[in-house]
UniProtKB/Swiss-Prot annotation:
GO terms for molecular function: rRNA binding; structural constituent of ribosome. SUPFAM superfamilies: L9 N-domain-like, Ribosomal protein L9 C-domain. This is Large ribosomal subunit protein bL9. It comes from the Bacteria. It comes from Streptomyces griseus subsp. griseus (strain JCM 4626 / CBS 651.72 / NBRC 13350 / KCC S-0626 / ISP 5235). The keyword Magnesium does not apply.
Length: 148
């Protein structure tokens, strides 16, 4: 079945790509969750709109990505989160929390989908986080999680 991706799907492609997948995968997973729509001739207009929106948020060149990487690595990120006595958090730190903390610390605006946590952050202390700016460029930064 031909579908148009509306979001980035690991192993398939990015938003706006037209891909061919098995019928069950499309009907039972991708379409109900909003990751894709069925391909139609009218859907081609949607593809153009999705691609325009993607270009706005896309970092075009490696040079731009390296500039943003330099800015990111100079930012000290601290997150104040509620925690218990033993240093365990109530919940966990999400990529959206990290992206908001980067912005609050004076860093560049980063999309939460670009923030990659190695494993869920559920304890106080220092943690390593990477931000995938370009397929070839990733910024590594330290995030300090403190009790609120």
């Amino acid at each position: 079945m031909k579908i148009i991706l509306t979001h980035e799907v690991s192993g398939l492609g990015t938003a706006g790509d037209v891909v061919d997948v098995k019928d069950g995968y499309a009907r039972n997973y991708l379409v109900p969750r909003g990751f894709a729509i069925r391909w139609t001739k009218g859907g081609e207009k949607d593809v153009a709109q999705i691609r325009r929106a993607r270009k706005i948020h896309e970092i075009a060149t490696i040079e731009q990505a390296n500039e943003i990487k330099a800015k990111l690595e100079g930012v000290k990120v601290r997150l104040a989160v509620r925690s218990g006595d033993a240093g365990r958090l109530f919940g966990s730190v999400t990529p959206a929390d990290v992206a908001a903390a980067i912005k609050a610390a004076g860093g560049p605006d980063v999309d939460k989908r670009r923030v990659e946590l190695g494993s869920p952050i559920k304890t106080l202390g220092g943690h390593q986080v990477s931000v995938r700016l370009h397929p070839e460029v990733a910024a590594k930064l330290g995030v300090e999680v403190v009790a609120a």
